[in-house]
Amino acid sequence: MPIQVLPPQLANQIAAGEVVERPASVVKELVENSLDAGATRIDIDIERGGAKLIRIRDNGCGIKKDELALALARHATSKIASLDDLEAIISLGFRGEALASISSVSRLTLTSRTAEQQEAWQAYAEGRDMDVTVKPAAHPVGTTLEVLDLFYNTPARRKFLRTEKTEFSHIDEIIRRIALARFDVTINLSHNGKIVRQYRAVPEGGQKERRLGAICGTAFLEQALAIEWQHGDLTLRGWVADPNHTTPALAEIQYCYVNGRMMRDRLINHAIRQACEDKLGADQQPAFVLYLEIDPHQVDVNVHPAKHEVRFHQSRLVHDFIYQGVLSVLQQQLETPLPLDDEPQPAPRSIPENRVAAGRNHFAEPAAREPVAPRYTPAPASGSRPAAPWPNAQPGYQKQQGEVYRQLLQTPAPMQKLKAPEPQEPALAANSQSFGRVLTIVHSDCALLERDGNISLLALPVAERWLRQVQLTPGEAPVCAQPLLIPLRLKVSGEEKSALEKAQSALAELGIDFQSDAQHVTIRAVPLPLRQQNLQILIPELIGYLAKQSVFEPGNIAQWIARNLMSEHAQWSMAQAITLLADVERLCPQLVKTPPGGLLQSVDLHPAIKALKDE
C-alpha cells in the first residue's frame, strides 16, 4: 500500500480514539469549553447514558458566525496562538481537537450566538471531507452543542460501551469534579428528562461548604480540615479529612486540581499520602479536595491526551510544599497539648526525615517499617484510637538507660546561667585532649574506650547532646542561620506570639529567624543542627517552652533545644563514634578534662581478671 494522506474524517476518528473514550469524555471536553467561554450557567441533558444524546447549553460569550466552520476544524482554537501561549496555559482546552474528533464519531450540531449578533447560527459537519454547513437558528446568547448517536459510524467502539447506568455514573462523576472546581458556576444535570444534579453557584465569599457537602457528603464535611497554605507563587487551598476518622467510603474522595484543572497526579497523591501516613493504616487512603495554584510557566499540561496529568518543572518543591501544607493542618488538630517541662523525656531516637529542610523527593512509597512507640503517648480520648507511631522512628534505649539519660537532660531554672559541667569522674591528666581509642560499640549506643591501659564506657547520645549544645550556643558572633527550602507556618496564640517577640533577639543569636503576623508565625531559617529535625514537632514545643519563661537567655534556650533534639543515630557505628568524639574533643575540651555525670564510666577489669586466675 503506498503512502497517502488520510481523509479528514478518518484522521479525526483516529484522534477521537485518544480524546473520546466514552460519553463522559465528551461531556468533559464540552463543559470545559463552556467554562473557557466564561459561562456562569451550564445545563447538561443526557439520554441513555450519553449514547443517544448529549446536550450542553451555556450562557458564555458564544462563537461568531464566520468562526463556526473553524470551530469544527482540527487544530483550530482561540486559546493559544504561539509557543509562548502553550508554555503558560490558563485555559482548560487549547489543542483545538475536541469538536472535530467528536463530530467525526457522532452527529454533532453547534448552535451559537454572540452578544453583538442579532441572530444565532448553527453549524454541523458531514461527509467524507467533513464539510461544514452553517445556517440560521434561534438561540439566546451562548452556545449549545448536541451530540447524537455517539459512535454510530464506529461499531467497534460502540460495542465497548457499558450499560446505560454505568456510563451515566461516569458522567455524574465528571460533573461532580467540575462542580468542585468552579463554585461560581451553576451546573444542572439531567438524565432521560429527569433532573439528577443541581449545583447552584456560590457567590464570592459565600459558603463553599454547602456545595462541598452536596458533592462529597456530610461524612466528609464533618471530618474536613480546611487548608490555606502559601509560599511564593504556590498556593494550596481546600480540605483534607481527619485521617483518624477515615473510612473506606471517605477514601474514595480524592479530588485534586492544578490551576482549576482536575488532575490525577502521582506526585501530588504521594505528598498527601506521606503527610497522613503516621495516622493511616497500611490499607487506608486519605480523603481530600485540594486546589493547587502555581505559576503557569512552572507546569506543563501538554503531557497527556486527556490532560489528566501534568509535569512540574520543580517537582521537588511542589511535593514538599504540598506535604508541609497538609501536615501543618493535621498538626494543628492535636487534641492533647504536647508535654513540655513537667513530663519525663524519652531517650533520643533516630530522626524522621524533615521534608521542610531535606528537600528530597522520593517518588515511591516508603518501605514497610515495624511499628514503634510514638514520641508522645497521651491518653487517648474516649472512643478515639491510639496515637499512631511517627514515621521512620527507630527503637529507643532500654528503660534503665532512658531513666539515667532523662535525669541528665533536665532544663535548668529560667534564671540559671549556662555553666560548665561539674566533674563527676576523676579528672584526666591536665595535658589530656583525648578520650582515648575506640575499641568497639556496646549495646548500640556506648563506646568502649582504652586510654593509658584503662578501660571506660562513653555514652554516645550524651556526648552528642553536649556537642549540639555547644554548636547552638552563640559565641562572639551569632549562630549561622540556614534558610528553609519552604518556610514553616504555624498558628500561635496571643501569649505565644508575645513570648516569641520578646525572645526574637535571643532566637536570632541562635540562628532561628521568624516572621509573625496576627495569628501565625513563619519560621524562615534555623541553625544547622536543626536542619534534619522534624520541625513540625520541635518548633511548637519550643514556642510552648518560651511562653512559660520570663527571661530569654540564648544559653538557656540552646540548652533546652539540645535536650529536645532527637538523636541522629538509632545504632552507632565505629566510624560515627570516632567522628563524634573527634568533634567533641575539638569543640568541647572541658568534657575531656572534667567529664560530666552520665558521660563516662570507668570499667574495672580487675575482678574479672582475678576470677579468671582463681579458676
Swiss-Prot record:
GO terms for cellular component: mismatch repair complex. Signal peptide: none annotated. SUPFAM superfamilies: ATPase domain of HSP90 chaperone/DNA topoisomerase II/histidine kinase, DNA mismatch repair protein MutL, Ribosomal protein S5 domain 2-like. Keywords: DNA damage, DNA repair. Residues 364-391 have a biased composition (Low complexity). This is DNA mismatch repair protein MutL. The lineage of its organism: Bacteria, Pseudomonadati, Pseudomonadota, Gammaproteobacteria, Enterobacterales. GO terms for molecular function: ATP binding; ATP hydrolysis activity; ATP-dependent DNA damage sensor activity; mismatched DNA binding. It comes from the Bacteria. The keyword Transmembrane helix does not apply. Belongs to the DNA mismatch repair MutL/HexB family. InterPro entries: DNA_mismatch_repair_CS, DNA_mismatch_repair_MutL, DNA_mismatch_S5_2-like, HATPase_C_sf, MutL/Mlh/PMS, MutL/Mlh/Pms-like, MutL_C, MutL_C_dimsub. CDD domains: HATPase_MutL-MLH-PMS-like, MutL_Trans_MutL. Residues 363-397 are annotated as: Disordered. This protein is involved in the repair of mismatches in DNA. It is required for dam-dependent methyl-directed DNA mismatch repair. May act as a 'molecular matchmaker', a protein that promotes the formation of a stable complex between two or more DNA-binding proteins in an ATP-dependent manner without itself being part of a final effector complex. One of its GO terms (biological process) is mismatch repair.
